[in-house]
Amino acid sequence: MDNILGTLLNMNGKTKDNLEARQDLRKMNLRPKLHPFTAENNKTYLPAACFTMTKKEKTDFLQVLHDVRVPDGYSSNVSRCVKLKECTVGGLKSHDNHILMQQLLPIALRGTLSDKVVRPLMELSGFFRDICSKTLRVEDLDRLENRIPIILCQLEQIFPPGFFTIWCIWSYI
């Protein structure tokens, strides 16, 4: 969740879209439109990506999260973690991240970015919502297993490679 919020909101120290990520794209010869360039004033610039939010889009997105009200005990007050002036979200507890990912992110993203960006993120939210549901049928797991590679491929076409944190899961015998 940190990678998603940090990158969408371009939060300092949290975003996975930075100069190094863009230089990696250049080295891999991927997405030339996103390669950094140096202007006449010798400053390096990063072209806007499809997931780059404008100030208004950030404000609209965060306003939804700030204004959301949930029943007591459902989650902590997410609005306390939203900083509208700084356009950041921080201090979320683990359960709040789950609620944000599974329930609130799809609502907050509507109307902010293009369908190309929003749809895979909404599907990822749906994946986590389904996999964490109280009841799961084998057919549901089969559907989810078939769908997740497609979702990840769509996300790989949108976000830079550094966006994807690699987790090592060790099996204990």
In which residue ranges do the predicted regions lie?
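A structural signal for the principal folded core domain
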Residues: 1-173
